[in-house]
Design a protein with these regions (language model features):
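Bacterial N-terminal signal peptides
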Residues: 1-10
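Short, charged low-complexity linear segments at domain edges
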Residues: 9-15, 270-296, 300
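Aromatic- and Gly/Pro-enriched helix-to-coil junctions and flexible linker segments
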Residues: 9-259, 312, 332-502, 506-546
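Short metal-coordination and nucleic-acid-contact micro-motifs, chiefly zinc-binding Cys/His arrays
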Residues: 26, 299-305
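Cys/His/Pro-rich metal-binding microdomains
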Residues: 31, 307, 326
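Short, hydrophobic/aromatic alpha-helical segments in well-folded domains
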Residues: 190, 237-238, 291-295, 305, ...
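Extracellular glycan-recognition modules
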Residues: 250, 264-265
Length: 546
């Protein structure tokens, strides 16, 4: 009789131990590979029934249970789970005790839900709108129906003045004046006026900039470590887009692909500041990790970054999905482009993304370790599999010349010539001033003369380079040795002239850099003398990491 009375208690205790001690461990360490999303080796462990069906436990005898043998194994190829640390002795003992007690399960145990069945991954369908008295707006009707079902009585409508105050604060972030509180125009007219206000874009841009992680650049001194210089251009684009009532979908496309969708429209290319903001100086993988993480969070509401080292614990995102997503961004880089009216990129410039290396290859990093790429398999760019049915086919596009060679634009060439001309004028003025000083300032005159010579050499180099570029861009694949050789020689002369100036300075780092530049220029000159004609196209942009 005592045994009979004790038996149900033991069964209940064993089932309770499973719920409290065993199932949480299985969920944390095993479901990712043996749950609803994936069943490696045909094993699923999210219910006791599935575990027993796979014959990996021998009820009452843990020593003969394959499950126990695998979690206790010292062989890395055999031990489960394969990632992370082994189960603790306490966790292993709890599993063995549970098996010894008969591997009992709680009554009515249900398997975990398939993440793909979650409403967030279902096709969007327009719901039926319930008919509710005195309510015309669909959202209000849906809310009212739910409130009625749950016995919730909504608060009464507020008076007009309070409603106007709330409207102002919501749409433009500013309180109304006393006169505006007395506005008797139709409600819709007030709403339209506030939506047309420039403050509307400024007020709501603040929230979107938080979601999209707007941040000005920062680093050490002049060194750029995070974000990009002049990123305020992206900020302005956000404000302007909201004020122009741009659709959310069009804004997302512009932020992710504005350089390809609008290659000859700098106003729209500003949107790619979203990607440029993720720049990180010290590690390319960290840079791309940030891009993947915050693109997923901002536009999908998903933590794709959790699948870098292993399949996602609870969302239908595999580790391969993570690297397919990375492959989309693998070729991209960031650069500063010149803007009309200012050739000095330190003062102004357009931070933007561009495809720098279309041949860049993506590999899976084993367990997320960038030092262990699996080079057996090349990963192609693609969205996560659960989105593949919606994905557009990848197509090659042809960009206009100024998009990939900004130096080919006439206004850019003119701006570079004007900047070089002003440097000559400034150096000339300094030389004239030095020549009128006393003999004690002879060293200053020597330096002023070198600066003047360097400015003139740089001006000639810009002129020759533009001439060579104009032929090169107008005649793809053809060569003009005279133009190319002149451009190359003037470039070398400009470097040598500038290195003389820097070597006379007091900055040790600049002097060292000048000596190295001089050495390279002389080597290049020697190559020219041997008949090897190569010149550098006009450099008007500044690429990240340069």
């Amino acid at each position: 009789l005592l045994v009979a009375l004790a038996l149900p208690i033991s069964v209940e205790a064993a089932a309770s131990a499973y719920e409290k001690e065993i199932k949480p461990v299985l969920k944390e360490r095993c479901y990712a590979c043996h749950g609803a999303l994936k069943q490696k080796a045909g094993l699923r462990v999210d219910t006791v029934a599935f575990i027993k069906e796979a014959s990996v436990i021998a009820s009452g005898d843990p020593e003969k249970s394959e499950l126990v043998q695998r979690i206790r194994s010292n062989d890395e190829e055999e031990r489960m789970p394969p990632e992370g640390h082994a189960l603790t002795q306490v966790e292993v003992k709890a599993i063995m005790d549970w098996i010894t007690a008969g591997a009992l399960a709680p009554e009515g145990e249900r398997p975990e839900d398939d993440p793909l069945e979650h409403w967030a991954f279902q096709k969007i369908e327009r719901p039926d709108i319930p008919k509710v008295d005195d309510i015309s707006h669909p959202v209000d009707a849906l809310l009212a129906a739910k409130q009625k079902d749950r016995g919730i009585i909504p608060v009464a409508a507020v008076d007009r003045k309070l409603a106007i105050r709330r409207l102002y604060l919501d749409l433009i972030g500013l309180p109304p004046t006393r006169g505006q509180l007395e506005d008797n125009r139709p409600w819709e007219a007030i709403v339209d006026e506030l939506l047309a206000s420039p403050q509307h874009g400024e007020r709501w841009a603040r929230h979107w900039m938080d979601v999209w992680r707007y941040s000005d650049w920062y680093g050490l001194g002049a060194q750029l470590r995070y974000s990009q210089r002049h990123l305020w251009h992206w900020r302005d684009w956000i404000v302007e887009s909201l004020n122009e009532n741009a659709g959310y979908d069009s804004m997302v496309r512009a932020m992710l692909a504005g350089d390809e969708l609008f290659p000859d429209n700098p106003d729209q290319v500003r949107a790619t500041g979203f990607l440029a903001r993720n720049y990180f100086l010290f590690n390319r993988t960290t840079w791309l990790d940030n891009t993947i993480e915050h693109t997923g969070k901002a536009f999908l509401g998903l933590t794709i970054n959790c699948a870098k080292c292993h399949d996602h614990k609870y969302d239908p995102i595999s580790a391969v999905d993570y690297y397919r997503f990375r492959a989309i961004f693998e070729p991209h880089q960031v650069r500063l482009d010149p803007l009309p009216g200012d050739a000095d990129l330190d003062k102004n410039g357009l931070p933007r993304v561009f495809d720098d290396n279309l041949e860049a290859v993506t590999y899976v990093h084993q367990r997320g370790d960038e030092k262990k790429p699996d080079k057996e398999t090349k990963i192609d760019p693609q969205v996560p599999e659960f989105l593949s049915a919606f994905a557009s086919p990848i197509k090659k596009i042809k960009l206009p010349l100024p998009a990939y060679a900004p130096g080919s634009s006439k206004w850019v060439q003119e701006a570079q010539l004007e900047a070089a001309k002003k440097r000559v004028e400034k150096a000339t003025a300094e030389l004239v001033k030095a020549e009128t000083t006393t003999e004690e300032a002879a060293s200053q005159m020597d330096l002023a003369k070198l600066k003047w010579e360097a400015a003139r050499a740089e001006h000639k180099s810009v002129e020759a380079t533009i001439a060579a570029d104009q032929f090169r861009f107008a005649n793809p694949g053809k060569s003009n040795e005279d133009l190319f050789r002149t451009a190359a020689k003037t470039q070398v002369a400009a470097v040598l002239a500038r290195s003389k100036v820097e070597r006379l300075g007091t900055d040790a780092k600049k002097k060292k850099a000048a000596r190295e530049a001089k050495k390279k220029a002389e080597e290049r000159l020697a190559q020219l003398d041997k008949g090897k004609v190569e010149y550098d196209s006009l450099r008007v942009t500044r690429k990240a990491l340069e």
